A protein has these predicted regions:
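SAM-dependent methyltransferase catalytic region
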Residues: 100-324
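Non-catalytic, mostly N-terminal accessory regions of nucleic-acid modification and defense proteins
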Residues: 1-137, 234-258
Length: 326
């Protein structure tokens, strides 16, 4: 950018914005201050503002209608569409490798498995899981009239379900997307949950924070996609409450990364938690970046997670009866 003073100035401005937003969005803008030496290593594309540049194309292609400027909650799903396009070339490379009998490694799995779910499918799934569960416990609710894809259960379908799921308050609903991608399922679940909280009389300024704290969980093997999911949910919350950032509530989005232990570390873990689990159990997530949400945690780990002191902040809610896998 040495020959483009204006582009250099905008690059410095971009770096400054990254530093500023780190406080509110640490999962999106990592600690990139000068003391970390990170933001100065950020590669700025040449000709940032030139004809045909990435920024210029983005401004021209992303119209106000695409971004949902007239919608109070915006159109955060555009983030997922952009990311799908961003990784499409890499995905094609991996797929071509499959045709040549090449196996996908940990680095190829995220690109190969990214599939953006169409909006109508998202609405159908969420309305007939989260929405139906709420309606079963609150049959007088009129919210279902707003759900275009909701299917009223027949008498046979609803018989006996009242005792299985008895959701008294919105906080009792826990929604987990074990392969959340850029968060399309969770962002629509946010909208539906907001309607539920609103109908129950909660203060509008409190609802976004309550949803992110109590209701929504996501897991993803693609670190970039996980960051985008957290960003999309945060923007959803911010669109509903202008003072949301002051609450300092972060989305419950977990990047699934491999965790492996050596034999001596296994012994230390058993001593620490006063259990006697073998190495295979402790290394359940050694290839988490390959298998992701396909991994079924052994019952011993589930019980340990639910009983450990750390579970007081809500880890154990991932295993209770009101958990909904989408």
């Amino acid at each position: 950018m040495a020959d483009d003073p204006q582009g250099l100035a905008y690059g410095l401005l971009l770096q400054s914005e990254c530093r500023f937003w780190n406080h509110n969005l640490p999962f999106m803008f990592e600690n990139v201050g000068k003391e970390a030496g990170r933001v100065d290593e950020l590669l700025m594309p040449a000709d940032l503002l030139a004809e045909g540049s990435v920024l210029r194309n983005a401004v021209e292609v992303m119209t106000p209608e695409d971004c949902g400027v007239d919608d109070p909650s915006g159109n955060v799903e555009i983030i997922g569409w952009l990311y799908q396009y961003y990784i499409s070339e890499r995905k094609n490379e991996v797929m071509d490798g499959f045709k040549k009998n090449h196996k996908a490694g940990a680095n190829e799995i995220p690109a190969a498995t990214q599939l953006f779910t169409p909006d109508w499918i998202v609405r159908y799934l969420v309305q007939n899981t989260v929405g139906r569960l709420w309606m079963q416990s609150h049959p007088d609710s009129q919210l279902y009239k707003n759900w275009d894809y909701y299917i009223q259960p027949s008498g046979d379908d609803s018989a006996g379900n009242e005792d299985i799921f008895n959701i008294q308050v919105p906080e009792d609903l826990t929604v987990c997307d074990p392969a959340c991608g850029s968060g399309h399922m969770l962002t629509y679940a946010f909208d539906l949950l907001y309607e539920i909280y609103e109908e129950e009389g909660y203060a509008p300024s409190d609802i976004p924070g309550l949803i992110l704290k109590h209701n929504l969980y996501g897991m993803e093997i693609d670190e970039r996609a996980a960051s985008l999911a957290a960003f999309a949910l945060t923007m959803k919350a911010r669109s509903r409450s202008r003072r949301f950032f002051k609450k300092q509530v972060e989305p419950n989005i977990q990047h699934i990364s491999p965790i492996a232990f050596k034999e001596d570390e296994v012994a230390e873990l058993n001593d620490l938690y006063q259990v006697n689990l073998d190495s295979m159990v402790w290394n359940t997530y050694a290839k988490a970046d390959v298998y992701g949400s396909l991994i079924q945690p052994p019952q011993e780990l589930v019980e340990l997670a639910a009983s450990s002191p750390e579970s007081e902040d809500g880890i154990d809610t991932l295993f209770d009866l009101s958990l909904i896998h989408i």
